Amino acid sequence: MAIAAVMLGPAPAMAGVGGSGYFPNVPLTTQDGKVVHFYDDLLKGKSVVINLIYTQCSGSCPLETARLSQVQRLLGDRVGKDIFFYSISIDPAHDTPETLKAYAAKFHVQPGWLFLTGKKEDIKRISKQLGLSSVTDAASLDGHQPALMIGKEATNEWMRNSAVDNPQFLAMTILHFFDGYNAKPVQSYADMGPLHGVGRGEYLFKSRCTACHTIGKGDRVGPDLLNVTRLRDRAWLARYVAAPDRVLAEGDPIAMKLFARYRNVRMPNLRLSTEDVDALLPYMEQQSQDIARPAPKGSPSAQ
């Protein structure tokens, strides 16, 4: 039975599924051109985090990679030491090692995270055995789901999670899955103080945009969005936020210029509704205004 059959939620895999007799030991090539074998070199005895990507993806892949880049920074030097990140291309005909290396650099990937390519039939087999393939893949714009497989091969425990979840949540999920009760304690909710209500625009920005953008804190993978609602035509901005892939495909000069300036990183189409865009743009506008507004006299930021 494939792992996919028991991976409907974040739960351990069935006992007896896994090991050298289950996972293919096929050769793959890293972004540095090194040939490795999937089971012997990448899985055996290791704690791993695996997802599927391809570099020409205009859907969830850029967000997946940006999110995992944030998670990698949160996990620090454990990535590559006792936790291993693997992103496997499902478009090996295009995604050569050189292409994958350039793609990783765009997202500021640190050492310890491998981007892998190989034969298409081998990658399909890996995807199926990991439980990362789905009957809905063909209907998906990306050809796959934005899923993440977290696994401890030594104990044959596996958990599937969204690859575009909150990075702090993902990092803590990974640590607790691998470390159990030995994981470092986190701050108590009692110490957090009062919580403010989160509006739709703020929720969308923090859940969909912060992996690649800031407002007033400089460029990341994409541009700083400070004053973007003032600098860009409102109708153009709304259309671009809703369907950036379509605007770029039409050869729009602003979209083309942004694409070139930010190292050909494709802004993902996040399937935002008109209502989503109508909430997101005012939030960005308000945040820009708050940054521009002088702090009250006597406040720490005014001193």
Model-derived segments and their meaning:
Residues 38-64, 68:
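Short active-site neighborhood of thiol/selenol oxidoreductases, capturing the structured segment around
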Residues 65-116, 120-123, 233:
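Structural microenvironment flanking redox-active thiols in thiol-disulfide oxidoreductases
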